[in-house]
Amino acid sequence: MKYKIEKNTVQETLIIPLYARKVCSELYPNLYRDETAVRLIDEIDYDFSEAEKNSRGLMQRFGSLEVAVRQNDLAFEVRDYLKGHPNAAVINLGCGLDSTGRSCDNGSCKIYNLDFPDVIAVRNELLPAGEREENIPCDLNNTEWFAKIDASGGAVFFASGVFYYFLTEQVRTLVQRWRTLSPAVCWCLTLRIGRR
């Protein structure tokens, strides 16, 4: 049975990056491959007709490449961090339906996927947490979720396209608080902030 995502919901925001990763996987398989995105598109009940119609245009092709390059860059940084901190916490902020944490799994790290409760509800249906993985429903600005993170082996935070929705001061406050989790913290963020 397919998972229904309605138009004009927070859950609908999952579609754009997921579809971009699928399109890039199809158009440029030697550059980028996201089997999870390809599979998930088939498991979601959503009207993709407009996305499909637009997906072959130059701007959409460029956008899908941009998403893929961003994901590859973040994955490279996470894997590099794990070389020196193999038992670290890998924390995907605003995870949506992204599987970057899993693709970086070294067999001993702990993976935490954080997003709003309604997004985590979708994720739990389509991408249930695996071994050493936890899907945490939360508001990133409410740092009570820190208590659920085991950062004793270090922590690498990554966020892709999340901070467009944050004020500059909110990002500054979060980064300052993250430093309290572990002395060995790394941030891999796309920091184009949407609101001042």
Where does each model-flagged region fall?
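Rossmann-like AdoMet
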Residues: 1-91, 95-138, 151-152
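Short, catalytically relevant binding-site loops at active-site mouths
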Residues: 140-143, 163-165, 193-196
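A short acidic, Gly/Pro-enriched loop at the edge of an enzyme's catalytic core
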Residues: 146-157
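A short beta-strand submotif of the Rossmann-like class I SAM-dependent methyltransferase core
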Residues: 155-160, 171
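Conserved beta-strand signature within the Rossmann-like core of class I S-adenosyl-L-methionine
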Residues: 156, 175-195
